[in-house]
Amino acid sequence: MEKDKHSHFYNQKSDFRIEHSMLEELENKLIHSRKTERAKIQQQLAKIHNNVKKLQHQLKDVKPTPDFVEKLREMMEEIENAINTFKEEQRLIYEELIKEEKTTNNELSAISRKIDTWALGNSETEKAFRAISSKVPVDKVTPSTLPEEVLDFEKFLQQTGGRQGAWDDYDHQNFVKVRNKHKGKPTFMEEVLEHLPGKTQDEVQQHEKWYQKFLALEERKKESIQIWKTKKQQKREEIFKLKEKADNTPVLFHNKQEDNQKQKEEQRKKQKLAVEAWKKQKSIEMSMKCASQLKEEEEKEKKHQKERQRQFKLKLLLESYTQQKKEQEEFLRLEKEIREKAEKAEKRKNAADEISRFQERDLHKLELKILDRQAKEDEKSQKQRRLAKLKEKVENNVSRDPSRLYKPTKGWEERTKKIGPTGSGPLLHIPHRAIPTWRQGIQRRV
């Protein structure tokens, strides 16, 4: 396609080289902008891809520490923000491209319909003109036979470019359609500019002035034709009355030859005038009939053209709807994939959080268990050391002496020792401890 395009451009005549160079420059700018945008998108996607790879690598070696979990959370938030930003940017770009595409399609369809209208309009108008010209002699339709208002209207059409005001039929019909929709209010200008992208506001305003004058002259033309028809009908009735009167009047023979000659001459003049008036009336009627036939054929052609345009618009709408539906399905599919990836990443994040939490819990339990075991072992070792010390103290070779059970203990002997008075005064009473009942009556050995 590129080779065919370049060969087509460079094989053209030198008269169109300027336009071709402008198109080529515009194309180079568009290519450069597409490359720049592609590089930017690839850079963003590469950054997101690298972040996802880093996250996957981190998830392979999970560490149950708060710092590690916080690091994973920050990485996932960064990836999610990057994906959301990328989606929002692409959505805005996509909407802008859709608007530009719709505008371009409208302009292309309008230009295409204009070209079709020109081709069909020229051929059909030429056929109709030839058919009417073959039926009506040219010398029969003269300006002198038409009313002044009709001549003014025809002159206005010739000077301003016909019934469309130098516009093509498609643009003029859209202008009239929108104007009738708004009933001639000034607010219809904006909608006309939307329907006619190739026209400026000044051109639309000038056409509106022309159309107002066109309607006024056309109304005057209709009124003058109606008045002219009424006058012609009255003249026709007078001529018929004179003719009937002349036919019914008996021919009088006068004696004088001059009177008869004058009377005949007057009758011939009246008849000649009546015939000429009748011929003029017939020629005017014929021209009016031909004009009405031409107008009817134009109306039929306009109806057919409108029907073709309607079918073409329906086809464009159907194609646009199909394309839009495909693009919407593709967008939904991509959005679903991105959402599923985000959900999987969220699940992996939650799983990593749960794993780290379980590992922390298990590690805490393990530490408690180890501490408990260590405490038990320490307690056991201390007990063994204490028992060993006691054994060292207690283990003596003592002979058995059953009689020692009945001997007083060292403490008892110390208690029974006589202790002299320590005070300066006489000791009157020394309190003694109570003797248990089971020892009462037992003689104390000295």
UniProtKB/Swiss-Prot annotation:
Coiled coil: 35-116, 219-400
Biased composition (Basic and acidic residues): 255-268
Keyword hit for Cytoplasm: yes
Localization per Swiss-Prot or TrEMBL: Cytoplasm, Cytoskeleton, Microtubule organizing center, Centrosome, Centriolar satellite
Segments for region (Disordered): 253-272, 390-430
Alphabetically ordered keywords of this record: Coiled coil, Cytoplasm, Cytoskeleton
GO annotations of cellular component type: centriolar satellite; cytoplasm
InterPro entries associated with the record: CCDC148/CCDC112 (IPR039902)
Record protein name field: Coiled-coil domain-containing protein 112
This protein's encoding gene: CCDC112
